Amino acid sequence: MPAEARDRSALAQKSFERLAEVCGDITAPVLEAYYREHPGARQSFVDHGLGETAKLEGRMVAESLFLLLTWTENQSAARIDHGSAIVHHNDTMRIPPHWYLGMVDAVLEVLLGTLPAEADDERDMWREVRSEFARFVQSLREEFVRSDGGAPLPAFPVAKM
């Protein structure tokens, strides 16, 4: 693993350990943040959850955490894992890229809320990861069979960083 990836991985581990210590299970606060920004996504979880909405929601929160960790350790692997998933979610399940990115943003909002003021290195790394992932999501939009409407993907609110 290149030195930069090791550094990012170490910062991510530090952030995730603190997140677990401070929050424990982050599912509820992540979903609160997610549905606040994407209220229309709630019905999609009900529809796709097939009676197991809470289980699906929990799995998507965990998937977003794992995506962020993987992105810091091996961006190529994360791109392979999520490249087809993002297109599939849009084209087959009608889950637009705003919602996909929104779940990652909700996880980051909760995670960033646990960082101490002096953790600029972690904060900067997560800003960079979010920016990289948003560019990746944007790059996949040209592969969509079903248009998502083309509205720009949102920037991560500075106030939440």
Each language-model region and where it sits:
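Globin-like tetrapyrrole-binding proteins
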Residues: 1-161
